From Swiss-Prot:
The gene is msrA. It catalyses: L-methionyl-[protein] + [thioredoxin]-disulfide + H2O = L-methionyl-(S)-S-oxide-[protein] + [thioredoxin]-dithiol; [thioredoxin]-disulfide + L-methionine + H2O = L-methionine (S)-S-oxide + [thioredoxin]-dithiol. The keyword Repeat does not apply. This is Peptide methionine sulfoxide reductase MsrA. Belongs to the MsrA Met sulfoxide reductase family. Transmembrane segments: none annotated. NCBIfam families: msrA. Its EC number is 1.8.4.11. One of its GO terms (biological process) is protein modification process. The keyword Oxidoreductase applies. Has an important function as a repair enzyme for proteins that have been inactivated by oxidation. Catalyzes the reversible oxidation-reduction of methionine sulfoxide in proteins to methionine. Pfam families: PMSR (PF01625). It is an enzyme of class 1 (oxidoreductase). One of its GO terms (molecular function) is peptide-methionine (S)-S-oxide reductase activity.
Length: 181
């Protein structure tokens, strides 16, 4: 039987930290770092970091929904971010680091809204959930040196996750390391 393919797009701050947790799951066919949500075509990393393009750093995931359904992607996504921070993620500040779920169809939109509501009512966070839910638009792959950063530079990747405060936050709120599911 042929595998199904769907897209999911998530902004979760620095895209380096958003690839590995998804990449290691069954049914995930591809995870690509890039830029989306803005008004500039084919932006560069420097342009996106200038906070003038409207784009956010994001990952676009190609997945088989029969193996790893969208609902599970949402659960894993929430466990990679601080969903209450509207100004960026951890040490990375500005619009390019703001969180968002970019839906590709009405079913994804509904599931994302339900998931956000459920998280807000869970009591895990005292502040309101600030993650945007937006319609997916063009996705521009990031430069090659940003792709699979955790594989190319494992030591720097680990240092960044810890140094940025992301790793400690995730352990505090979810009680396990980022890559344990």
């Amino acid at each position: 039987m042929a595998e199904k393919r769907e897209l999911a797009t998530f902004a979760g701050g620095c895209f380096w930290c958003m690839v590995k947790p998804f990449d290691e799951q069954p049914g995930i066919l591809k995870v690509e770092s890039g830029y989306t949500g803005g008004h500039t075509e084919n932006p560069t990393y420097e342009e996106v970091c200038s906070n003038t393009t409207g784009h956010r750093e994001a990952v676009q995931i190609t997945f088989d929904p029969d193996v790893f359904p969208y609902e599970k992607l949402l659960e894993l996504y929430w466990q990679q971010i601080d969903p209450t921070d509207s100004g960026g993620q951890f040490t990375d500040r500005g619009e390019s680091y703001r969180t968002a779920i970019f839906y590709h169809n009405d079913k994804q939109r509904k599931l994302a809204e339900e998931s956000k509501k459920k998280l807000g009512e869970s009591g895990i966070f005292k502040d309101p959930i600030a993650t945007d839910i937006l319609e997916a638009g063009p996705f521009y792959p990031a430069e090659e040196y940003h792709q699979d950063y955790h594989k190319k530079h494992p030591e720097r990747y680990t240092q960044y996750r810890i140094g940025s405060g992301r790793e400690g936050f995730l352990q505090q709120h979810w009680g396990r390391k980022h890559d344990e599911q």
